[in-house]
Amino acid sequence: EKYSPDAWMLNYSNPAAIVAEATRRLRPNSRIINICDMPVALENIMANILNLESRKEMIVKYYGLNHFGWWTSITDKAGKDLMPELKAFVKEKGYAKETEDYQHRAQSWKDTYLMAKDVYALDPETVPNTYLKYYLLQDEVVEHSNKEYTRANEVMDSREKEVFDTAKGIIEKGSAEGYTFAVGAHATFIVDLACALAFNTKERMLLIVPNNGAISNFDPEAMVEIPCLVGSNGPEPLAVGKIPEFQKGLMEQQVAVEKLTVDAWMEHSYLKLWQALTLSKTVPSAKIAKKILDELIEANKEYWPELS
């Protein structure tokens, strides 16, 4: 804002939904675009299922919150409806298509892709984001989780270790010769976004933006993940219209969690954070929410403000 007021900040920071809500309130005049590559990664899988060369052959309609959304329409550029074929696959196998890339995935991802079929069953009119399993299939997720070795441990022992070890090797060698990095959705998406801003391409992209009526029957202030056309003036959100009661109810509850979390940080409020955790569909009761909160405070006391 002070030194480069015309610059765009492309923000991948997690937890993306809460960070987006915080930037909306605390930095309303900054040119921040909040993004997540999860929908893009899933669209790559969808394109593979549909035997397309690229996800960019698809025109998608999608709405929701970050890690909390649904595809309502997917066509090719000629207008052919691709949803029936995709739904038939997801109904039987989720997003678990046997490919070379799939074979190299961690087991937790394979389980996640397969569980999408159970999430899909709740609304066969759409296809879901995989992360909805945490909000709709909580018992099953907990039952198959190892509290001694969580998803975070898996990431630290695999992707994070590989990246850091490679970076250390390059530094020690003084050269990147002989090293290779795979370019995935995380990298290509942010480059596509930067190019759209720089060259006014008007590319259609899924971004996290203020609703402002795009979803007509939803909180206008909520940060929603919807298609936008991106050019040199930034994102232009596309109208979604009215959404079904099932998704609306889920999203309203989750937005309340996100807003209360930001309230808690701004006000240093123990009560607001307890309320946020109690509202989360990943937490079964207020009593357990309080226990989780107290353990989170202890684990993060070096980083969190003091709550009262």
Located regions from the model:
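Long, compositionally biased stretches enriched for glycine and/or charged residues
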Residues: 48-308
